[in-house]
Amino acid sequence: MTNADDSVIDAPIDAPIDVWVDVLIIGGGIAGLWALARMQQAGYKTVLLESQALGAGQTRYAQGIIHGGTKYALTGKLTASSESLADMPTRWRTCYEGNGELDLTQAELLSDAHYLWSTTSLTSRISGFFASKVMRSRSSAMESASDKSSLPSIFQPKDFKGQFYRPIEPGFNVFRVIRALA
């Protein structure tokens, strides 16, 4: 018995297949999945290629912190790198709340910020001072005497004399973000 589909069944496996796409994305990490979703939203025929599993590369080792440029401002000046990241925390939070360019409502927010601290060494104090001035709108300095009780207990030793900073940079569960984007 034959049918019209026999030619497909009998086709050699190594036969070339023509595939026409507008955008080819290589890498199935968070950046690749984000780009895939945005390109598809814009109406592009898009294909994503991943040699292993989604999130198997660098994404697997990520801490999930959505940086807003704080770590790049530790030199005491705003750089192109720090400025290009300035809006990322807000952008991700908006997506997590269901009001952004992508739907990340199924992702898991682990923390709305994280902590940095400086010691009493001269270089640490200078770095902390300049970073706090440059990043004034993106982090809040926490005076160790007045705000110490609001810190996690590990950061409350009586003999600590440094300064705490709380960059407003959220942390997400990386694997839940991958699931939300996939």
Where are these regions (language model features)?
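A short, basic/flexible loop-to-alpha-helix module at the beginning of a structural domain
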Residues: M1-W20
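Beta1/beta-strand and adjacent pyrophosphate-binding region of the FAD-binding site
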Residues: A15-A31
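Glycine-rich FAD pyrophosphate-binding loop
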Residues: Q40-Y61
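Dinucleotide-binding Rossmann-like beta1-alpha1 core, especially the glycine-rich loop
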Residues: G64-L151
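N-terminal Rossmann-like dinucleotide/flavin-binding domain of flavoprotein oxidoreductases
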Residues: S81-S82, I178-A182
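Helix-loop-beta segment of a Rossmann-like dinucleotide-binding subdomain
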Residues: D147-A180
